[in-house]
C-alpha cells in the first residue's frame, strides 16, 4: 500500500546524506568542531546547546550523551542543553521568546566555553541572539544549519551546514548523524589526555 512512498522517503534520505558527504568541507568542519569541543573540556570549559522544536530535542540529545554516555563507559563531559522549562517560560513571559537562550548564555556562559546552536533554516532569532551573547562572553560558537545557512551563515567558528532545501526533517536526520560523530570524536580526543 505505501511501499513506494517508503522507498522514496528512504531514497531521499540517502541522497541527502550522499550530497552532504560529497563536500569535503563538511568532513573537515565536523573534525574542527570535535577538536574545539574537546579542547574546551580539557581547559575546564563546557558546552551549552540550543535549538527549537526538533533542533531543541537534538540539543538535548547532544548534551545527554556527553554527560551520560554514548557507546562506551567514560567520565561525563560538561554539557548543558538550554531546556529548563521554568527558565524558558520565565524569559518568554518577561522578556520575549527571542531571549530564552541568550539570557541563559549571559548567565552561565564564560570565555573558553562553547555554544552549539542548531537551526535547520539558520534563521531562528533566539539562536542568533544566543550566538551574539556567546560572542560577548568570549565563547566559541559551532552551528548546525541547513539550506543556505540563513542569517546564521558566517556567524560561527565552525558551521556545519546541510545544503538541503526540502523539508527540515532531512536536515535533522543529518544533524543527528553529525551529533553522534562529534561525540565519538570528542571521546577519542579526550582519551588522548
From Swiss-Prot:
Enzyme class: isomerase
Keyword Ligase attached: no
Residues that hold substrate according to the record: 52-54, 65, 93-94, 119-121, 124, 172
Cofactor note: Binds 1 zinc ion per subunit.
Sites where the protein binds Zn(2+): 61, 65, 172, 180
Functional pathway: Carbohydrate biosynthesis; D-glycero-D-manno-heptose 7-phosphate biosynthesis; D-glycero-alpha-D-manno-heptose 7-phosphate and D-glycero-beta-D-manno-heptose 7-phosphate from sedoheptulose 7-phosphate: step 1/1
Gene3D superfamilies: Glucose-6-phosphate isomerase like protein, domain 1
CDD domains in UniProt: SIS_GmhA
Annotated keywords: Carbohydrate metabolism, Cytoplasm, Isomerase, Metal-binding, Zinc
Cofactor: Zn(2+)
Domain of life the protein comes from: Bacteria
Catalytic activity: 2 D-sedoheptulose 7-phosphate = D-glycero-alpha-D-manno-heptose 7-phosphate + D-glycero-beta-D-manno-heptose 7-phosphate
Location of the SIS domain: 37-193
GO cellular component terms listed in the entry, alphabetical order: cytoplasm
Location of the protein in the cell: Cytoplasm
EC number(s) per entry: 5.3.1.28
Subunit structure: Homotetramer.
Function: Catalyzes the isomerization of sedoheptulose 7-phosphate in D-glycero-D-manno-heptose 7-phosphate.
Family, as annotated: Belongs to the SIS family. GmhA subfamily.
PANTHER family: PHOSPHOHEPTOSE ISOMERASE (PTHR30390:SF7), SEDOHEPTULOSE 7-PHOSPHATE ISOMERASE / DNAA INITIATOR-ASSOCIATING FACTOR FOR REPLICATION INITIATION (PTHR30390)
Misc. comment: The reaction produces a racemic mixture of D-glycero-alpha-D-manno-heptose 7-phosphate and D-glycero-beta-D-manno-heptose 7-phosphate.
Official protein name in the record: Phosphoheptose isomerase
Native species: Klebsiella pneumoniae subsp. pneumoniae (strain ATCC 700721 / MGH 78578)
Gene field: gmhA
Amino acid at each position: 500500500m505505501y511501499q513506494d512512498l517508503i522507498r522514496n522517503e528512504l531514497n531521499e534520505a540517502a541522497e541527502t546524506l550522499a550530497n552532504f558527504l560529497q563536500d569535503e568541507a563538511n568532513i573537515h568542519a565536523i573534525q574542527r568542531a570535535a577538536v574545539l569541543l574537546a579542547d574546551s573540556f580539557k581547559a575546564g570549559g563546557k558546552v551549552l546547546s540550543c535549538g527549537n522544536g526538533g533542533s531543541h530535542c537534538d540539543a538535548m540529545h547532544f548534551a545527554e550523551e556527553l554527560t551520560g554516555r554514548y557507546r562506551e563507559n567514560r567520565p561525563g563531559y560538561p554539557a548543558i542543553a538550554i531546556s529548563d522549562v521554568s527558565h524558558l517560560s520565565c524569559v518568554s513571559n518577561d522578556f520575549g521568546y527571542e531571549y530564552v537562550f541568550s539570557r541563559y548564555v549571559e548567565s552561565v556562559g564564560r570565555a573558553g566555553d562553547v555554544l552549539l546552536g542548531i537551526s535547520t533554516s539558520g534563521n531562528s532569532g533566539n539562536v542568533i541572539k544566543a550566538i551574539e551573547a556567546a560572542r560577548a562572553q568570549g565563547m566559541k560558537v559551532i552551528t548546525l544549519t541547513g539550506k543556505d545557512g540563513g542569517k546564521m551563515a558566517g556567524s560561527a567558528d565552525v558551521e556545519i551546514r546541510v545544503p538541503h532545501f526540502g523539508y527540515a526533517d532531512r536536515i535533522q536526520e543529518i544533524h543527528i548523524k553529525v551529533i553522534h560523530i562529534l561525540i565519538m570524536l570528542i571521546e577519542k580526543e579526550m582519551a588522548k589526555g
